[in-house]
């Protein structure tokens, strides 16, 4: 069993806490999404009694999606993106590649073709660099389908893009005219 698999429950709960519900363990995030490591560990022990700094460091180091980051002095931790809470990640606008991809479940295709990609409860729409990653994302929600996003045209039209610390591209919305359904399994 890999270290990532070993701490899967803790990692999923950490994601919930740092992205959506810090109050679930009685902590708060600052305006940039950071939580104090010592307070987080202390309060995580209520749900996972053996939780420790070593386990937290293993989760951060082995997470295949690089969901989390420590502050430079390792006293704080945050999720790299995916928040439903209002946080400012201090990301700078970036020029995106010519195209990016978005994976979703087939049941959402009709709505997306009509209304485009919306951030829903998150702060941004998440886009992937490649079809394989987008397919994995889509498969989490059911039968996956992939949209190709014409990010070059979007950027030229004034849409702003950000690149998160773990390589996920973020934007506020993707109107239907910039979408092309490329995989419909």
Model-assigned labels for residue ranges:
Residues 1-185:
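Eukaryotic, polar/proline-rich low-complexity intrinsically disordered regions
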């Amino acid at each position: 069993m890999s270290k990532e698999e070993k701490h899967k429950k803790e990692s999923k709960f950490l994601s919930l806490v740092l992205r959506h519900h810090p109050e679930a363990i009685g902590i708060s995030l600052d305006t940039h999404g950071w939580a104090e490591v010592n307070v987080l560990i202390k309060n995580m022990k209520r749900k996972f009694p053996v939780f420790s700094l070593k386990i937290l460091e293993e989760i951060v180091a082995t997470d295949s999606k690089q969901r989390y980051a420590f502050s430079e002095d390792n006293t704080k931790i945050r999720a790299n993106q995916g928040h439903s809470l209002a946080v400012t990640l201090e990301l700078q606008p970036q020029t995106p590649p010519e195209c990016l991809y978005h994976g979703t479940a087939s049941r959402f295709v009709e709505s997306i073709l009509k209304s485009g990609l919306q951030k829903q409860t998150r702060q941004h729409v998440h886009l992937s660099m490649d079809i394989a990653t987008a397919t994995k994302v889509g498969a989490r929600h059911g039968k996956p389908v992939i949209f190709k996003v014409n990010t070059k045209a979007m950027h030229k039209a004034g849409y702003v893009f950000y690149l998160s610390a773990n390589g996920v591209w973020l934007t506020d919305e993707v109107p239907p005219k910039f979408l092309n359904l490329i995989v419909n399994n």
